[in-house]
Amino acid sequence: MGELLHVSSSPHIRSKVTTDYLMKMVIVALMPATVAGVCFFGWKALLLVCLSVATCVATEGIYETLMHKPLTIWDGSAVITGLLLGLNLPASAPWWIPVIGGVFAILIVKQLFGGLGQNIMNPALAARCFLLLSFTGQMTNFTAGGGLVKLVDTVSGATPLAAVKAGEKVDLLSLFLGNTQGTIGETSALAILIGAVFLLIFKVIDWRIPCTYIGSFAIFVILFGGHGADGYYLLEQLLGGGLMLGAWFMATDYVTTPITKRGQLVYGVILGCLTGLFRIFGASAEGVSYAIIFGNLLIPVIERLTVPTAFGKGGVKHEK
């Protein structure tokens, strides 16, 4: 389905499915994670997500109006950017964090590169990385609570991955259900997987990128994580942090992924290895956002190496 939005090497595929339809389906698929975030972190989480969505839509509308461009706020792409950005924020973040992030995502990453289909990075993830670098304290404060479900504590509000990196064990059921610390939309693997199954059933996304991403990450952890084939540690890494949200909803972004099937497999492997590299050998316990951003920048190279050879190209020239 990504062929609708992707400016890529030929061959180009025609489809009757509209961009508007695809965006609405992704929005629906993100609802379980959004609802779970509100249940675990309270109404403040919903406020941050709504602020993020409103800022993204408003920024896109204002920019396109001022630049005398056709309004695209109704296609749903800005809403998805706002949703993903909001779900990648800690519930304790101040109100101005999603506002700054939303403006950066739409104005800098998306519109200044030409709008939908032209941006070279996932706008929501680029904004999250920008916020992490610029407002580290606000973006790494995971002490929020106040939801309908009591959160399982680790150490002073640390995320499960931080606890794992410190040598602690974390509760796998809490990681699966989501009643633990983390960003608003990443804690519940169950809610994310419900949305992922929805997208797969309706063929909104392809299995190749998320499955090769998660699979290659698992292999990397087994080989280099220092715990061998320890199933408990592997599940902590798979269910903790932003891997599930990143693999199913951000690595599959239509604009910033390869269009060829071989390219998608290569892309997934690269993301899995980069995430493992950042998590295991990096200073931070997480690495999904940076891995996907680096992967986005490699898309032209991946496509150049994996694009099918045109019929008749590369044949042997016979002398007359």
Locate the predicted segments by residue.
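C-terminal ends of transmembrane helices
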Residues: S10, A58-P70, I106-G117, I194-K203, ...
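Cytosolic-side transmembrane-helix boundaries in multi-pass membrane proteins
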Residues: M1-L22, F281-K320
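Loop-to-transmembrane alpha-helix initiation sites
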Residues: I120, A124, L234-G242, Q264-V266, ...
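Membrane-interface helix-loop-helix junctions at boundaries between adjacent transmembrane segments
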Residues: A78, L83-K150
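Long hydrophobic alpha-helical segments that form multi-pass transmembrane helix bundles
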Residues: Q118-L193
